[in-house]
Amino acid sequence: MTKVHPKFQNTCEKSLCDSKEAVVLTVWKKSLLFNCDGFTVYNSNGELVFRVDNYMNCPKDNIVLMDASGLPLLSIRRKKLSLGDCWMVYDGETQRDPIFTAKKNVSIMTNKRSLVSVSSKKTVLYEIEGSYSQRSCKILDERRNKKKTAEIKKKEAMVGGVAFGKDVFKLIVEPEMEPRVAMALTIILDQIYRY
């Protein structure tokens, strides 16, 4: 019988973080499990790297990003009782001391192109600009003079330049950013702009 994911030692995550070049991931907005909503993420070799499995009936206020073997890497939780969309990201499945917070920009007084601001302890880390609905976003590092650290782009077929649609896209992560953080920000964008 075919297994959803074989038992193997996951070395993909380590090799992703140690890369000196940009990592190109293919993100498929579909869970590997039946009757689940989520994401399946592959590297350029076609190996499973990350996955997110949420049951259809469950609220999407608590999302767990897992590696290929199902170990939790990051927990993404919606902050309750906040103005606007605000998400807290924790290491593993803990609920203490968030690594960072991502908040939708809703200011009408400024002419910002930013969709989301990512901060840690009141220090802005990243700004996300572009259009998630068009799968054209850039994650800019505020600490490095707005240097692009990751990008979401439409994925096209190798032959004929045919686009796959909005459920399959590329996540290009520069070496300065952890791929799991870039994927967490992609999940948050999807939750904020899902309609």
Which stretches of residues belong to each language-model region?
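Low-complexity or membrane-interfacial segments used for flexible interactions
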Residues: 1-61, 68-71, 84, 95-195
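Extended, low-complexity, charged alpha-helical tracts
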Residues: 77-79
